[in-house]
């Protein structure tokens, strides 16, 4: 009884498309999802997740036919043949010892095995709960010599089937399922067949040699030894000549100093006799666990022997120098960030232009800069200790009474402790993919005061790059000409978890390490009163030095509204970006200051700006959600969520559904036309086809504050904090009216969008463009009472796919609801067509005439006003006039359903007035007569254009039916009637 009820419920789901093909009113269709997880066409066998679209979204280059989310996949879902369904049900209702024994959960066994040479044919029985996932991934072909057939790709995480040993393994081919041949079926059909029955009989085939090869290869991967590779990393001379530290850190009083003293003691004992050295080299536990060293050609590097007495003597002298105290020999430069392919290391061997043929070592992090005894003879004595060079080479530091080195040329002092151990001049200089959240230098005026931030989202996180320094590292501004750049930064911990600055450096040592430096011994390239800003490195530029003090809020606000501000420093050589005024005062959107900030924005007086809202096109790309959680009451019902975007409390866009297996990666883009927008809200809802959707998370973003740093024309990535928990990664961009309505011509002459109307209708031999006519007719065919029409935005990805097909085949493109279920995609294409015309449908000259007509129109004489407006419209070019009549008739039809779609004349005019009137016609503006009291035509004034369009719509006649033969306006709006263009006179 339970099995038959489940089968009926499943049949109802698959036949109805999860509750019907139409979404609830006011909600666009969710995006389409393919049933493939990887490029190898893997497929998960979780039927519930598959039916509720839990797999990866459709690629932008997929065919248009896959945009229909309400239909089952081709060949699957509700289109399984009845014969196949009967075979599945017959085997499912058969008797089995596993079902009779009452085993709960998933169970599997091998019923028969028939070896045929290298191939083995097995009959496998699997008993599972209805709808239970097998945790199995399928693919088409084996990835080697076959491209057809259904093969097991891999097991999922915590797969129950993987615990049954030799029943089924990756690489096996599935021949039949419940006596149904599946070799020539699609992966979607196979997944559906596996999800329906409770009892499965699978006939599989595998190769013994291939299965053994797969098992052995996986075992070898799990037992990989630790190997340290040499990596060549070429660096510029400017980097190698720049000092790491003019005052090296003294670690005598820390755990690092203790370890260095232990190392020194061991080395002194090792020099007493060769027997002790040999014994120490063979019995030291460090040697047993030390990583094997290989060079760039994968050849092992042997440990050289130290047998010469000269080397022993030199090493003994080096280790026993009276001036070589522990506080000096334990000086270790702070760690640096290596490339992304190797571990983070401390560099000890980067002498510029110096190469040595002596073998190189890798030392543990706790070791000192004392070199081994066998290579001391091959280098000068001054190069062994950079602190004991001649005064001719090193400047004298009057503050410390010692010689300071600004350019370390010692080939031993840049030796890597883990991975890259070649000189820096031989390594690659490609460090563009490193973390941007490691400690950087800043002048420390007070005592120890490290501010740890956890609200900075690194760009590398969005790119999928891992950086262990991005977890807990303070922010310091770095000089642009030093080795401590944005790409090469230091790590405060030694790699062990839980260590902080207090465990590594004392207070004096940390101030010495993080303090200012100078190539001449005291200061760096910036004097004590100057520094480089970390915000200036956002665009990879190097700006002029500027002060560290933030100017008054009034001065900054005046500079934003256009008041001249005298520069306090010479202008930079590099041309400033739009955010130069903020860079000049070291203003960052992620403020790290102790001064109190206003809640209005990131240290900026937004009230003094010249704009208070945004009007233009808002580009919103919803990337993914992090830390999202479905409420406890909803966990048993659904695991899918979608995001809703509101602008000024108005519903404007909605994403498709996504699951936790997809890590809630929506990755959908929307182009939203906004008028005086100030706030955008993001709501995350749980989705279920039958139950009410529940609000799970919400967040808000003030648009003006998001774009004020880039002066309103740029895009940024935000990690928006949601309530009660989680983050939403969004990229938001904005283009103002000047950038949107440039009215440029499409260079593709055979295209449809962005082509002159006269050229387009002449080529198509039609009165109106084919694309515009078909799109309007399709919307009217579906009904103009759709809530959210022309307000909700369709997905940009779907819109691009449909637009590409219309460009290539305007007449043959399928626009029915079965192919394009989202009406918002079609509505957005209509607006794009009008927006991208090289010239507006209503030119500025005609607009000026309409303004004069509005000034002399009589309030109660509709017929006279209509006659006047139609005479003005007749002055347009024939192609523009016919297209305008088509659009105005459509808008009049839309207004007839205003109680249902919520579009009032004012709201509809704000949407379409910019599309019909706006342009950048600043060369020959229309000037009205001197006697008129009307103002001049403003080509980008949305209020003026909206009032003109409202006047036209208020007197526009209703659509007439050409079959009636009457020229009188119809009393009702005819949706299916043929358009009869009204033209009462000619100019």
From Swiss-Prot:
Broad class of where this protein is predominantly found: other
Organism of provenance: Caenorhabditis elegans
Superkingdom as given in the UniProt entry: Eukaryota
Biased composition range(s): Polar residues: 269-286, 427-438, 479-497
The name this protein goes by in its record: Rho GTPase-activating protein syd-1
Phenotype upon loss of function: Worms exhibit an irregular shape and fail to show axonic polarization. Uncoordinated movement and retention of eggs, an egg-laying defect are apparent.
A Pfam family recorded for this sequence: C2_SYDE
Biological role stated in the UniProt entry: Probable GTPase activator for the Rho-type GTPases by converting them to an inactive GDP-bound state. Regulates the localization and assembly of presynaptic components during presynaptic development and is required for specifying the identity of axons during initial polarity acquisition. In these roles it is thought to act cell autonomously downstream of syg-1 and syg-2 and upstream of syd-2, possibly as a positive regulator of the latter. Required for the control of movement, egg-laying and the correct localization of elks-1.
Region: Disordered, residue numbers: 266-334, 348-369, 424-446, 463-497
